[in-house]
């Protein structure tokens, strides 16, 4: 199980106004543990991987497009009643996130946070690691960007949407095969990342006008342009796509995860982590941290059972 960690952490941070006895918000910690406990109960993974966005986000993508993720507003919480100014709320969010990382460093969970690298790239690299070629992989994230990674051995669980996506039901739902999903998204754009697409062209239009994208074969921008240039295709959508060819290319270069934007050193570090992995579980330290933070009442039964199972399986 490969978890887009910040994507899940921010859910709890936003909605849970819980405070510890010292008056500090701890909703992010509480809810993340609850979510992780539920995930392990449902999925029963043999290996647990948490991947966090590195500090500073993707330097490579920003160098390709200075507007990438520009204009994003800080996440809005529903716990303004805690009486903290914006700077204090930001500091608390960082503290809660680092505290979660500290918790799971005491467990068999493998964690990654590469500086100036997005979690997406690390998740793609982990998913494609030859060590796990025969493993069934479950990526956990609400982010549609990961649909492009789905194959016979990889599915996507979107907890907020309460759905599991595989390469077959993605075609049924969107009319686009995962192998062509990044291309389709490049045409449509992604407002959440401040990447505009071709005007007035959505996923349904792409699926309808380029029906070959539902095939497992991987198609590229030149195939889209060739379709647009057919004499019988006179609708506005085709000319708009031709006019925005460069925009689509730039979007695709940023959105694609088939070639994750990781340095050789980062890739080697990830490989070494897996090769040297020796699962451990310091339950005493975890309980100590939970007591300090006022979250000792949070249920961790399924997590603890899974931790012990992982340790047992790797010791055999």
Task: Pin down the residues of each PLM region.
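Non-catalytic nucleic-acid-binding/docking modules located in mid-to-C-terminal regions
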Residues: 38-52, 67-74, 80, 107-110, ...
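Noncatalytic, basic helical substrate-engagement surface that gates or grips nucleic-acid strands
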Residues: 1-138, 146-164, 256, 261-275
